[in-house]
């Protein structure tokens, strides 16, 4: 019988923090997104069209040359947000990735011809 009041007190004690949070009626509040003006929307659409047309021209141009490997790897392509980025193709993206990974690795010193090494400790 002693366990029933103890369990009730424990339950109320654990439930109390949950009841202390305010509950707001989410039906009254609506999600309000920022409204862009029509001019801003038109400019964004025009920029996206320009970027798509330029990438299409580059793609068609590289196919006309014969292979995708002959494309200029440092060609700048506009993004829909208006910034320019360098287009990397094939092997160039692998070299960039390997350079980034090489920076994070620790360079270990060579201890001459000492063959007696355990993990990173050499005698």
Swiss-Prot record:
Q: Where is this region: Disordered?
A: 63-91
Which biological process annotations from GO are given for this protein? blood vessel diameter maintenance; negative regulation of blood pressure; negative regulation of glomerular filtration; negative regulation of heart rate; negative regulation of insulin secretion; negative regulation of urine volume; positive regulation of angiogenesis; positive regulation of blood pressure
The keyword Cell cycle is assigned to this record: no
Biological function? Highly potent vasoconstrictor.
The region annotated as signal peptide is: 1-20
The record's Gene Ontology cellular component field reads: extracellular space
The protein here is known as Urotensin-2
Please list the tissues where expression of this protein has been recorded.
Brain specific.
Family, as annotated? Belongs to the urotensin-2 family.
Provide the propeptide boundaries: 21-104
Q: Where does this polypeptide localize? A: Secreted
Keyword Disulfide bond among UniProt keywords: yes
The primary gene name is: Uts2
UniProt GO molecular function? hormone activity
Disulfide bonds, paired cysteine numbers: 117-122
| Keywords on record | Cleavage on pair of basic residues, Disulfide bond, Hormone, Secreted, Signal
